[in-house]
Amino acid sequence: MSRLSQLLNSKKAKQKPPSEHPIGLSSILKQDSSSSSDSPNFFPSSSTNDHQERDTINDTNFVVPEKQKTSKLALLAAERKKLHSSFPSTQQQPPKTEKEKEKEPIQAKHKKNVENDFLLQRFRKVRIAEKKDSEQPSSHEIHLTDDDDKTTLQKQMVESDQLKKNPQEVKLAPPSSFAKCLTGAKKRVFEDQIEIHLSKSSLLGFNAPSPDDIVLMAQSKSKSFQKHKRLDEQLLNSVKSMKKVSQQLKPQKNTNDSNNDHTLLSQDQLIELSKLVKPRTKLLLLGPPKSGKKTLLSRLFFQIGSFDPKTMQKCTVLNAKKESLSSVLKSTKTKWYDFETFSNSYSSTIIDFPLGIFTTNASSRDNFLKHSSLFQVMNTAIFTIDCLNPLEGLDGISSILQLMNGLSISSYMFAITKMDEIEWDENKFINLVNSIQSFLKESCGIIEKSKFIPISGLKGTNLTSISQEKLSQWYKSDTLLGKIDKEADTNHGTWNFLLNLPLSLTISHITPLPENQSHIYCSIHSGMLQDSQKLYVGTGRLETQITGLSSDENPKGFNVAGDMIQAKIPTLPNLCPGILIADSIDAFTSSKTAYVNATWFHGSLEKGKSMHVIALFGCHAVLTKLYCFTDSQEKAPNAIGNDLERNRTSLVKIELENAFPLVKESYINTLSRVLFVSEKWNSLIAFGTVLSLHD
């Protein structure tokens, strides 16, 4: 007899009504099927009769032999019982004590289980629908088992109960995968990497800076820039304190005036304060079109930290926006671009110069005057040569080198651009340098190989650091910035000498203002300038006073040689660009006659043609007579044509139509440079330096 039959017989013996305790197998299966029909068939639900039968079986003390066989129905019942017990139910067993009334009814818990089963089935349906819709399933998809589903559901139910009880103590988390599935939202496939296209980058459109460049930029910002910013503030405070002391030392009638801006410092005080001012060197960037001038200029500015990111975003070479560099960097009317080097902390100025300005097809008089006067103030020239087209533009470079030699400008260098496109090949670089040297040898003499620098303006290589393995294996000289700093060292003594000279500045641009006033843009060539200072304008020495002085430099209370300033002056007769302004009547000698060491362009001298002489950064006068000294004899221009063909450098005597300021070479070289221009202002005839003056 089976164990189940023995159990039934024992129950009948006790004469208990079967309606109250249905313990038969048929009744057990019937109740299971009826209870399961009310709920989804995925999970078997528990019922009250099951609990009663388990209690009844546990109450019996009958022991079944181990080897006793069981029927198929008994195995099925045990299997369903095992399946039911494998899912831990959240409902609590009804205690046998009196606290049973306080617990939730079993039917409510049964309904809750039915709802959970329904949600889980919907979860699976959504998952299956997503797999069918997506062609490439996500690698991050997590396949949960039934146990995981049940556990996840229980955790979310507990969290929702806590949120209802203590809504302020529970922190809300992002939506879970389960919540997204319930709402029908499709999951997006995660990307392992995020690619940012260079053309859409907010900072640069070319390659990112190297680690060396990042360090150098950090140094320039943190050390040099901050250091000199403090020095500029200290200098401005010193100027204000000196003016305040000078104001207090004035007579009693002027002490009530609290404005110290119009108080002038003495020359000794200015010289002492000028020791805190950074030296200034002026660079000229020259090269044929498409040789990489603006790319070089922009990348150099970026690497030394002169640009803020907002300005960088506007440049053509830095992003996809088609804006020219000159339209972005509008610092002054003359388009000089200021920057500072971090090694020696010099303040430098650079300009992009057109090579064709000295050809017969040059532009108008004003444009020629503006560009030709740059050679009278420049210290260093940088020529850009495309390594892919090295011979392009060498004719213009040859003419400018002749001009620089005649003006005693020996500081220049050649930047061989786009070297990254030939993979920094040493042999190609050497052959390129040899071809340039041989081309310029006849007209300009031998050029040292140390003046040639291989660079890449696009990638920034060899501008501030080499940071390229192949280049560092054979190039052992300085970077472009290192050579600029060395040239600034050589020009430092000249700059100090300029500060001790009388004040001289020339007007580059004039804008009329109401009330008989004019707004002027000027370049200071020597001396130092203060606001409300008394000045003398032009050869007529008209007295005036400058007001509203400002500059693009950091405010320091005064301006020195090399600065470009803006100011207001009363409108005067014959006030025009190029006119000289000085602080003393006898500061510069005006003369009609001078001896000049001149260098002539080939075939530029024409018989019977008049010329203009440009001196002192824009001042000019008509040349009436010219005498050349060859073979120790004075000859007229029409008698020395053949001699000029043989000897292009000669001593000349000039006689001008009207007297204008000229400076001897012994005074200072940059102030003594003169240019000879054709009558139509379209070609350069000769250039040189003034050796002596005669009344």
From Swiss-Prot:
- Offer one example of a GO biological process linked to this entry: endoplasmic reticulum unfolded protein response
Indicate yes or no for the key word Nucleotide-binding: yes
Q: Which domain of life is it from?
A: Eukaryota
PROSITE patterns listed in its UniProt record = G_TR_2
Concerning Pfam families, the annotation shows: GTP_EFTU
Q: Where is the composition biased (Low complexity)?
A: 32-47
Report the main location listed first in the record: cytoplasm
Molecular functions per Gene Ontology: GTP binding; GTPase activity
Q: Where does this protein hold GTP?
A: 287-294, 357-361, 417-420
Q: Basic and acidic residues bias: where?
A: 96-107
For this entry, the protein name equals Uncharacterized GTP-binding protein P8A3.05
In its UniProt entry, the species of origin is given as Schizosaccharomyces pombe (strain 972 / ATCC 24843)
